[in-house]
């Protein structure tokens, strides 16, 4: 009896086949739970590898679960390779907690690029936020020296962009310069997903279409929502992957669509917690992903990108 073909390989879609290596929680939406479903709604075949499997995210009083190590990741990749299943158009990575696991992911990227040289690697370099690291310091060096050169698109927040470039971002010009520094190191697309300057929240995006050329840069002013949510960075990076692949020459349009989805989802989440009688400012909130399917598929763009000259 012959093995039937994998239809996502035999009949590839016009979107792509994504390998997403991120965390997983049984309850709630962070990591792969935030990324896989939206990408599937946008038409992608997504194969998740769960770097951890926890009962819930670590913001709860307790959590239980397992952590995947580098050898176990290699075992999964070897299983795919043995069955000729290693052709992917995209790899997506998020939170990674150890140098050894990150080094193994780099080996995986190189192996996948040997199968598909046009592989797009989208990396959310999750290291910390608001001036605080929540990964070991040695990971910063690995991201800067090894990961950034391999990435096709990078989606740091303000703090992470500062750690990767050594540049303090105190103005829009600093944000644009940080993007240029990152372009010089590797990725053609950089989106600093959240920057706070003078109390104003914005996103700065940059697309260098050819090495040596001046990048096309833009900003989107973002409405602050008075609450803290989990899983939003994972969702944002997945949406940027999804829309930037559909609009490869218009990163600003991709960012508009991603931001619009996220804003609508966060407003719904906030409203639903209020309807349930819960004070949404008292702790981090689980996002209403399933209830926001239409906003993922067909976002209404309310916040427009403004291109820098």
From Swiss-Prot:
What pathway is this protein a component of?
Answer: Cofactor metabolism; pyridoxal 5'-phosphate salvage; pyridoxal 5'-phosphate from pyridoxal: step 1/1
Tissues/organs with expression: Expressed ubiquitously in leaves, stems, roots, flowers and siliques. Present in root hairs and other tip-growing cells such as papillar cells on the top of stigma.
| Catalytic site positions | 234 (proton acceptor)
Which top EC class is given? transferase
Q: Which residues bind pyridoxal 5'-phosphate?
A: 58, 233-234
Q: Which CDD domains match?
A: pyridoxal_pyridoxamine_kinase (cd01173)
Gene inactivation effect = Defective pyridoxal kinase results in both salt hypersensitive and root hairless phenotypes. Hypersensitivity to Na(+), K(+) and Li(+) ions. Increased accumulation of Na(+) ions but reduced K(+) retaining under NaCl stress.
**Cofactor annotation comment:** Divalent metal cations. Zn(2+) >> Co(2+) > Mg(2+) > Mn(2+) > Ca(2+).
User: In its keyword annotation, does this UniProt entry include Signal?
Assistant: no
Q: Which reaction(s) does the protein catalyse, per the Swiss-Prot or TrEMBL entry?
A: pyridoxal + ATP = pyridoxal 5'-phosphate + ADP + H(+)
What does the entry say about activity and pH? Optimum pH is 6.0. Active from pH 4.5 to 10.5.
Q: What cofactor does its activity depend on?
A: Zn(2+)
The positions annotated for binding Mg(2+) are: 129
Please report what switches on or represses expression of this protein.
Both long and short transcripts are down-regulated in roots but not in shoots by NaCl and abscisic acid treatment. Under cold stress, the expression of the short transcript is increased while the long one becomes undetectable.
Quote the record's binding site residues for ATP.
124, 157-160, 193-194, 225-227, 232
Return the EC number: 2.7.1.35
Q: Which residues bind pyridoxal?
A: 23, 58
Top-rank taxon, per record = Eukaryota
For the modification N-acetylthreonine, which residues carry it? 2
- List the GO terms this entry assigns under cellular component, sorted alphabetically: chloroplast; plastid
Single GO molecular function: pyridoxal kinase activity
Q: What GO biological process terms does the UniProt entry carry, in alphabetical order?
A: hyperosmotic salinity response; pyridoxal 5'-phosphate salvage; pyridoxine biosynthetic process; trichoblast differentiation
Q: Which NCBIfam families match?
A: pyridox_kin (TIGR00687)
Complex formation: Homodimer.
The entry assigns this protein to a family as follows: Belongs to the pyridoxine kinase family.
Full protein name: Pyridoxal kinase
State the organism named in the record: Arabidopsis thaliana (Mouse-ear cress)
Q: Which gene encodes it?
A: PK
């Amino acid at each position: 009896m012959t093995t039937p073909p994998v239809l996502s390989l035999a009949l590839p879609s016009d979107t792509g086949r994504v390998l997403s290596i991120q965390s997983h929680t049984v309850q709630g939406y962070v990591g792969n739970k935030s990324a896989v479903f939206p990408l599937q709604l946008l038409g992608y075949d997504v194969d998740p590898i769960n770097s951890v499997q926890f009962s819930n995210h670590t913001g709860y009083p307790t959590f239980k679960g397992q952590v995947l190590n580098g050898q176990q990741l290699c075992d999964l990749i070897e299983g795919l390779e043995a069955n000729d299943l290693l052709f992917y158009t995209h790899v997506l990575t998020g939170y990674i907690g150890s140098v050894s696991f990150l080094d193994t992911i780099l080996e995986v990227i190189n192996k996948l690029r040997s199968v598909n040289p046009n592989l797009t690697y989208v990396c959310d370099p999750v290291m910390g936020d608001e001036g605080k690291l929540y990964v070991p310091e040695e990971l910063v060096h690995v991201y800067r020296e090894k990961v950034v050169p391999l990435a096709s698109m990078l989606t740091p927040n303000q703090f992470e962009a500062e750690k990767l470039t050594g540049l303090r971002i105190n103005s829009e010009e600093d944000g644009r310069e940080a993007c240029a520094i990152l372009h010089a190191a590797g990725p053609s697309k950089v989106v600093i997903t959240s920057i706070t300057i003078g109390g104003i929240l914005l996103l700065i995006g940059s697309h260098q279409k050819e090495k040596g050329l001046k990048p096309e840069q833009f900003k989107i002013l973002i409405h602050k929502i008075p609450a803290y949510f989990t899983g939003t960075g994972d969702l944002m990076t997945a949406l940027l992957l999804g829309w930037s692949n559909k609009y490869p020459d218009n990163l600003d349009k991709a960012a508009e669509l991603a931001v619009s989805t996220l804003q609508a989802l966060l407003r719904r989440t906030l409203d639903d917690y209020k309807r349930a009688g819960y004070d949404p400012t008292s702790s981090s909130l689980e996002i209403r992903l399933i209830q926001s399917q239409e906003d993922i598929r067909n976002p209404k763009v309310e916040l427009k990108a403004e291109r820098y000259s």
